[in-house]
């Protein structure tokens, strides 16, 4: 029976193996997810400025993918770009709607 008992050297080697060390699993600090403004870019897709709001949606998705890849600074930068492009798209869309309504109602008046 003594031949099946683990020796002290075996226990020491097992305790120092990387698979047995679970304390190092939490060495990465948890970085909070930066805002990617996905909801804003989806809302901007309803405005009639189609090439611009599609670019905002792409920036937002790229921000999410950058965060998942571990590029936190790139995710923050792309999220900020998505926000400003979506705001520009909404403003341009509202201008297009306003101008088309003004032209329509002044012609038929």
Swiss-Prot record:
Residues 42-62 dip into the membrane without crossing it. The keyword Transmembrane helix applies. Keywords: Cell membrane, Membrane, Transmembrane, Transmembrane helix. It is found in: Cell membrane. Residues 21-30 have a biased composition (Acidic residues). Residues 1-30 are annotated as: Disordered. The keyword Aminoacyl-tRNA synthetase does not apply. Coiled coil: none annotated. Residues 1-41, 63-84 are cytoplasmic. It holds the Pfam family CD225. InterPro entries: CD225/Dispanin, CD225/Dispanin_fam. The chain crosses the membrane at residues 85-105. GO terms for cellular component: membrane; plasma membrane. Residues 106-109 are extracellular. Interacts with the giant stinging tree toxin ExTxA (AC P0DQP3). Interacts with Nav1.7/SCN9A. Interacts with Nav1.1/SCN1A, Nav1.2/SCN2A, Nav1.3/SCN3A, Nav1.4/SCN4A, Nav1.5/SCN5A, and Nav1.6/SCN8A. Belongs to the CD225/Dispanin family. Probable accessory protein of voltage-gated sodium channels. This is Transmembrane protein 233. It comes from Homo sapiens (Human). The gene is TMEM233.
